[in-house]
Regions:
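N-terminal glycine-rich phosphate/pyrophosphate-binding loop and immediately adjacent elements
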Residues: 1-108
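Rossmann-like flavin
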Residues: 70-175
């Protein structure tokens, strides 16, 4: 449209975290990768009678993300629930209890969606209909942001705790 645009990129190829690059004959996705089920990697290697440790090393991160808000407040997001509560308390003490409740509720969602239903084929409408009561109980009709907001009052914390759909190209305000 005739706009004069300058692209600034750290890497030799464009795309930032979403770039694709080639190295040693392989094509890599340079995007953010979160491995939430490392046991599945082990299962894949076992199918080929191989050991993952012979090919890769997974290193758990102490800090998963660091958020820096407009007011320069920093938050180190991690899997350490106690540390998360301490940081939440610094931003809004009232949200610590809401965070505990949110974590407990999302564990139920994970148990249903990943643990119980991950291997269930939804190849017939009846199979999906059987899950309708559980989907309603787990508030699957709410967006991620809306669900988080029902437990968390502080806007910074709401945005931070709603960001996960972004990792797979989703919108926290519309993704359920």
């Amino acid at each position: 449209r005739g706009n004069d645009v300058t692209l600034i990129e750290k890497h030799p190829d464009l795309g930032g975290r979403a770039r694709v690059f080639k190295k040693n004959g392989f094509i890599y996705d340079g995007g953010p990768t979160v491995i939430t089920a490392p046991h599945l990697i082990n299962e894949l290697f076992e199918l080929f009678k191989k050991k993952p440790k012979d090919y890769l090393e997974l290193t758990p991160l102490k800090i998963w993300y660091q958020f820096i808000f407009e007011d320069k407040t920093r938050f180190n997001y991690s899997g350490d629930e106690e540390d998360m509560k301490k940081q939440i308390e610094k931003i809004n003490r009232e949200d610590v209890l809401g965070y505990k409740k949110l974590v407990n509720f999302t564990k139920k969602i994970f148990d249903k969606g990943f643990t119980e239903l991950a291997d269930v084929p939804f190849d017939r409408p009846f199979v999906m209909m059987q899950q309708l009561p559980a989907l309603l109980k787990l508030k699957s009709y709410k967006s991620v942001y809306s669900l988080v907001s029902s437990y968390i009052k502080n806007e910074k914390l709401r945005r931070m705790l709603s960001m996960h759909p972004l990792l797979v190209g989703g919108n926290p305000f519309t993704t359920t």
